[in-house]
């Protein structure tokens, strides 16, 4: 089958932003103008197409990344048809995992900002994630019709707070109630959209006299930014003082693809102004899969190899999301980097080392689905029938094996106990939690060995609330939920602590014998770079002369690794520890894997107790935005919560207070901040680092366990 859309006309893009920037409304307008929806859904009505989960429609926030495909031929229909695969990502900090895995498979992004609120805490988090994956992006300053809208100030904030190099492509005509349209700096014409046609009809007009000077200056800045792309363009610009429209676009595109500049558009998605021109910008300025560097991976022998975005290359794809669909079961969302895949084909999972057959391939439109026969390089689709795939797995041609770089997901920072309300809920709950954990790598489930309770862990209170809510709605499981608990960690402060343990049992017949001598130390920065570090723990075997036979070394390491999952201090995971196996002995008859495993575990527990063990608590980076009147109260409250103030900034919506606060002090903070400021302040927090808990806090936590 011939490819319907050439790969250079593909755009795999994400719509990214903080909460309330109008991201989902912007996505809805894209669907409307591209002809996918014949009626617009509004977030505040709970009718947005991209927000398809019940909780999303109720809460008015996007939780999971909905994927959809649309086609665009330009605002004036003059361009060849381009295919946009769009992912709408959540803006709440508890769901940054969704943003992270979307960015991993996208080629470009549209960064939606609120013209009133400007750059918010979540904007910074998302920006850092986009930098990590070197994603070219452009900005859309939305809500230009709102009271307090200020385009220039937002552009300034992009520079000051995100370290970006923004290049405005437009100048707004008016603001707030007087927002009429935009000036296109390429054509030096004003664009006015017709309200009666919901923005589908537009016209070019002359630039209003009072804005000619401002537009000329902005255009000169844009042309200069384009000229800096190459020496050839710069020479032409210096000699002629101007560049042609095509040359400007060429220069800007080149610099956008290198993530040197951020082209900035503006409008009001709600008032149907500006999204249309921004879509033209996606075609002109964001990359196709063929413009991105070939994706890197490792072959069977561990050598580095690359996949070019071409149909003629062997098939390779990355599974970036697993979802449970009520009608078809498990859906695996994947991005094809190279080659072609037909429904019914076999794929090789190079992470699990397994072959699987792809049943059906679906093109997703939010939670609607169309069955398709094949996918090609650059496509994003969902597969039905893959049984043993998890997020981050590579799917490839079994004759050309490659493992693409895996995604690294953050460790959960908050836990709570859940128990089924009735016996019939018991079995269903296990299945539901298993499915949800498969979908979301930042959500973990475990059973507390002592109490037998099921413990769920995630990235924040809202994250776990929604998990419990989904259990009830999608799996019909009613559960009681305990209080949120902090995910503490344990470590040591003393170095080179020796621990000698001999496990001996003799009770007639074959006995048990295992003897190990270990040295325990905190991991240094050099240790952290050691190739054998796994999960913040380093095991080094220094046995010589066969005092412990080789076959018992692996059980010793296994015994240590099992022990560190529940530390001796208070049962929390142990981190940042190095263990050297330095000596031991064995018995020809009585030694076994189990005996050495037990000896290693006991040696570690004894050594850990002597190595000055400490409890670590998660510290959150908190940003509070508030009117100035409440600053004193808020700062006093931060101090009472053992917070450390990091400084203040000005924002378009008030003062910004930055602080580091222990997670244990942040439960219920939303309610307390609301009552302190009459609901006028907002906050966002994300995990920053672990640090030693004060003795009184550590004692309380240890006594509870």
UniProtKB/Swiss-Prot annotation:
GO terms for biological process: ribosome disassembly. The keyword Nucleotide-binding applies. PROSITE patterns: G_TR_1, G_TR_2. InterPro entries: EFG_II, EFG_III, EFG_III/V, EFG_IV, EFG_V, EFG_V-like, EFTu-like_2, G_TR_CS. Transmembrane segments: none annotated. GTP binds at residues 17-24, 88-92, 142-145. Residues 8-290 form the tr-type G domain. One of its GO terms (cellular component) is cytoplasm. GO terms for molecular function: GTP binding; GTPase activity; guanosine tetraphosphate binding; translation elongation factor activity. It is found in: Cytoplasm. Keywords: Cytoplasm, Elongation factor, GTP-binding, Nucleotide-binding, Protein biosynthesis. SUPFAM superfamilies: EF-G C-terminal domain-like (SSF54980), P-loop containing nucleoside triphosphate hydrolases (SSF52540), Ribosomal protein S5 domain 2-like (SSF54211), Translation proteins (SSF50447). The keyword Cell membrane does not apply. Catalyzes the GTP-dependent ribosomal translocation step during translation elongation. During this step, the ribosome changes from the pre-translocational (PRE) to the post-translocational (POST) state as the newly formed A-site-bound peptidyl-tRNA and P-site-bound deacylated tRNA move to the P and E sites, respectively. Catalyzes the coordinated movement of the two tRNA molecules, the mRNA and conformational changes in the ribosome. PANTHER family: RIBOSOME-RELEASING FACTOR 2, MITOCHONDRIAL, TRANSLATION ELONGATION FACTOR G-RELATED. Belongs to the TRAFAC class translation factor GTPase superfamily. Classic translation factor GTPase family. EF-G/EF-2 subfamily. This is Elongation factor G. It comes from Xylella fastidiosa (strain 9a5c).
């Amino acid at each position: 089958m011939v490819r319907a859309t050439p790969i250079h006309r593909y755009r795999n893009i994400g719509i990214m932003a903080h909460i309330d920037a109008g991201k989902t409304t912007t996505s809805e307008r894209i669907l409307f103008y591209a002809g996918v929806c014949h009626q617009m859904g509004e977030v505040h009505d709970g009718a947005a197409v991209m927000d398809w989960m019940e909780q999303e429609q109720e809460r008015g926030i996007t939780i999971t990344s909905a994927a959809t495909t649309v086609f665009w031929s330009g605002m004036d229909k003059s361009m060849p048809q381009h295919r946009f695969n769009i992912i709408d990502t959540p803006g709440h900090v508890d769901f940054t995992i969704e943003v992270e895995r979307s960015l991993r498979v996208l080629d470009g992004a549209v960064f939606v900002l609120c013209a009133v609120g400007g750059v918010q805490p979540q904007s910074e988090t998302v920006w850092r994630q986009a930098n990590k994956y070197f994603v070219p992006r452009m900005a859309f300053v939305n809500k230009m019709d709102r009271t307090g809208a200020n385009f220039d100030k937002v552009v300034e904030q992009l520079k000051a707070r995100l370290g970006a190099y923004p290049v405005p492509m437009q100048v707004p005509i008016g603001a707030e109630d007087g927002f009429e349209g935009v000036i296109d700096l390429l054509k030096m014409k004003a664009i006015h959209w017709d309200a009666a046609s919901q923005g589908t009809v537009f016209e070019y007009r002359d630039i209003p006299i009072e804005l000619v000077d401002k537009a000329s200056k902005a255009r000169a800045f844009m042309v200069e930014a384009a000229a800096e792309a190459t020496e050839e363009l710069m020479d032409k610009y210096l000699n002629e003082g101007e560049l042609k429209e095509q040359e400007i676009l060429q220069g800007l595109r080149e610099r956008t693809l290198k993530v040197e500049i951020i082209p900035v558009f503006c409008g009001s998605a709600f008032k149907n102004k500006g999204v249309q021109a921004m879509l033209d910008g996606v075609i002109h300025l964001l990359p196709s899969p063929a413009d991105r560097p070939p994706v890197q991976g490792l072959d069977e022998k561990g050598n580095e190899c690359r996949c070019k975005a071409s149909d003629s290359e062997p098939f390779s794809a990355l599974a970036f999301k697993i979802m449970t669909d009520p009608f078809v079961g498990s859906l695996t969302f994947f991005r094809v980097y190279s080659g072609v895949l037909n429904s019914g084909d076999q794929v090789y999972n190079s992470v699990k080392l397994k072959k699987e057959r792809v049943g059906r391939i679906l093109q997703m439109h939010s939670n609607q689905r169309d069955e398709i026969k094949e996918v090609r390089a650059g496509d994003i689709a969902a597969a039905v029938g893959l049984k043993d795939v998890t997020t981050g797995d590579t799917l490839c041609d079994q004759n050309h094996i490659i493992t693409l770089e895996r995604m690294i997901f953050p460790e959960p920072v908050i836990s709570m106990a859940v128990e089924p309300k009735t016996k019939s809920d018991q079995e269903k709950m296990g299945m539901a939690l298993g499915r949800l954990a498969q979908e979301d790598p930042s959500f973990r489930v475990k059973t507390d060995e002592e109490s037998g309770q099921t413990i769920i862990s995630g990235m924040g209170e809202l994250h776990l609330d929604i998990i419990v809510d989904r259990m009830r709605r999608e799996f019909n499981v009613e559960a009681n939920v305990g209080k949120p608990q902090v995910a503490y960690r344990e470590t040591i402060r003393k170095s080179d602590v020796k621990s000698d343990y001999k496990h001996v049992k003799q009770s007639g017949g074959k006995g048990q014998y295992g003897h190990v001598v270990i040295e325990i130390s905190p991991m240094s920065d050099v240790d952290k770079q050691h190739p054998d570090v796994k999960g913040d723990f380093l095991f080094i075997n220094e046995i010589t002369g066969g005092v412990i036979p080789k076959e018992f070394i692996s059980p010793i390491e296994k015994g240590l690794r099992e022990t560190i999952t529940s530390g001796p201090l208070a049962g929390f995971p142990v981190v940042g520890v190095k263990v050297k196996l330095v000596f031991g002995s064995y018995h020809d008859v009585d030694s076994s894997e189990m005996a050495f495993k037990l000896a290693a575990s006991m040696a570690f527990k004894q050594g850990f107790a002597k190595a000055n063990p400490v409890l670590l608590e998660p510290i959150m980076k908190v940003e509070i935005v508030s009117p100035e009147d409440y600053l004193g109260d808020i700062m006093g409250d931060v101090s009472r919560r053992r917070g450390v103030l990091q400084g203040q900034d000005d924002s378009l919506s008030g003062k910004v207070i930055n602080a580091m606060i222990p997670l244990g002090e942040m439960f219920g903070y939303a309610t307390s901040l609301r009552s302190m400021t009459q609901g006028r302040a907002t906050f966002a927090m994300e995990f920053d680092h672990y640090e030693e808990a004060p003795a009184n806090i550590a004692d309380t936590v240890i006594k509870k366990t």
